């Protein structure tokens, strides 16, 4: 039995929505990591009052006041993009900045729709942080996103809460739906039809919520359970939102000994995942519609592919190049260092199965998810894997190595 840390995506949204509510909220089981601390601290600087700890936090919203200092987003793209949507709807001036990694990630995709709504932005060349926002009284828009992005969709929807008129977001494919799901449960008029989300401006009262375990964190252990000899792993109290279970769907397509069930609903579906050693994995071409639903987990498919029969192919995943690192390049370069044959595409990769991972040293380039991936690879390698600067896992999963050690011992 394994419990993974609370969900990072939902923690960000719970903090933001509780700060936007009209009355106090009580939040249970929030994830405390470097990314979510940035969201918490920014909301505090804007005037929100927090009491308690991350296991039980009371949130007392206040009207936002213009901050004197620039607001630090650290390494958190979610903080930057979601707070851009919120701040665009307040008639005040704010500046967002981040660490060197975040300052290389593109912000044009969120600036464009928010400027169409009436906010003004000024950013570095090529629309990188730091970024100044002059908020305004916004107008609702109908916007087609160029890529399926839950962060862009959420930024526009959060801005639409205080806009005049209806806000519509249309995506090329479905992305994570935490924001619209939570808003709807809070009584905000939200309609979802396929990849189209329609929101009417609204206010809402405070709420009580328990954050489920993070399926993206559980994914590392679920994959380990499938590829490690004599493994049996059960993950409990984990979020099973259908827009987050893409990896589980792909593992079933590959023939993994895997099952999951929903045991309760609390704004989000929560349940249990069970996995056992899966010696008969088969390579797959990951279906295009699943790619946006597992964007953070796609590199793990390469690890599954090493042990599968036949070819495993990921395409239409160019978004991976715009994460904390260029995850396609970092994956391919480091797998080759470990003796794994892998082919790189502009929008993905291909790996031929039934290989072995010899071992060696890798550099995740400060990317928390890549560091965790290579650590899992080390456990199924011949000689072990040395992961440079592995402390970067604290961005999303501070006790990853402690939990990994427990799993290996048991």
UniProtKB/Swiss-Prot annotation:
Keywords in alphabetical order: Amino-acid biosynthesis, Aromatic amino acid biosynthesis, Cytoplasm, Transferase
Keyword Transferase recorded: yes
Subcellular compartments: Cytoplasm
Main location (coarse class): cytoplasm
Reaction equations catalysed: 3-phosphoshikimate + phosphoenolpyruvate = 5-O-(1-carboxyvinyl)-3-phosphoshikimate + phosphate
A GO cellular component annotation in the UniProt record: cytoplasm
SUPFAM superfamilies per the UniProt record, alphabetical: EPT/RTPC-like
UniProt cross-references to Pfam families, sorted A to Z: EPSP_synthase
UniProt binding sites for phosphoenolpyruvate: 8, 77, 105, 151, 327, 369
Family the UniProt entry places it in: Belongs to the EPSP synthase family.
HAMAP family with a match to the protein in the record: EPSP_synth
Name of the protein in its database record: 3-phosphoshikimate 1-carboxyvinyltransferase
Gene that this sequence comes from: aroA
């Amino acid at each position: 039995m394994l419990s993974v840390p609370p969900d990072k995506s939902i923690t960000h949204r719970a903090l933001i929505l509780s700060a936007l509510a009209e009355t106090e909220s009580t939040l249970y089981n929030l994830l405390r990591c470097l990314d979510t601390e940035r969201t918490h601290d920014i909301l505090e600087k804007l005037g929100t009052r927090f009491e308690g700890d991350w296991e039980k936090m009371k949130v007392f919203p206040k009207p936002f006041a213009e901050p004197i200092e620039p607001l630090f987003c650290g390494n958190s793209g979610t903080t930057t993009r979601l707070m851009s949507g919120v701040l665009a709807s307040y008639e005040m001036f704010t500046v967002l900045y981040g660490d060197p990694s975040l300052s290389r990630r593109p912000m044009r995709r969120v600036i464009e729709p928010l400027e169409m709504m009436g906010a003004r932005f000024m950013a570095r060349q090529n629309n990188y942080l730091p970024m100044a926002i002059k908020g305004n009284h916004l107008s609702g828009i109908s916007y087609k996103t160029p890529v399926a992005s839950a962060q862009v969709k959420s930024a526009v929807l959060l801005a639409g809460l205080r806009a005049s008129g209806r806000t519509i977001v249309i995506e090329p494919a479905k992305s994570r739906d935490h924001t619209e799901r939570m808003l709807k449960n809070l009584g905000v008029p939200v309609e979802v039809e396929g990849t189209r989300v329609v929101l009417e401006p609204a206010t809402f009262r405070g709420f009580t919520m328990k954050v489920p375990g993070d399926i993206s964190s559980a994914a590392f252990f679920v994959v380990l359970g499938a590829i490690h000899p004599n493994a049996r792993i059960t993950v409990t109290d984990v979020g099973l939102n259908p827009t987050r279970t893409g990896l589980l769907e792909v593992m079933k397509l590959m023939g993994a000994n895997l099952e999951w069930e929903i045991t309760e609903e609390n704004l989000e579906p929560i349940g249990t995942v069970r996995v056992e050693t899966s010696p008969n994995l088969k390579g797959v071409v990951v279906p295009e519609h699943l790619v946006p639903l597992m964007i953070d987990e796609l590199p793990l498919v390469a690890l599954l592919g090493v042990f599968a029969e036949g070819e495993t192919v990921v395409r239409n995943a160019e978004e991976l190049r715009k994460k904390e690192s260029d995850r396609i390049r970092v994956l391919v370069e480091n797998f080759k260092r470990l003796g794994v044959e892998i082919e790189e595409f502009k929008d993905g990769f291909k790996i031929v199965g039934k290989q072995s991972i010899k071992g060696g040293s890798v550099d995740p380039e400060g990317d928390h998810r890549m560091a965790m991936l290579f650590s899992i690879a080390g456990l199924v390698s011949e000689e072990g894997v040395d992961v440079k600067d592995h402390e970067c896992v604290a961005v999303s999963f501070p006790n990853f190595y402690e939990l990994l050690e427990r799993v290996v011992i048991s």
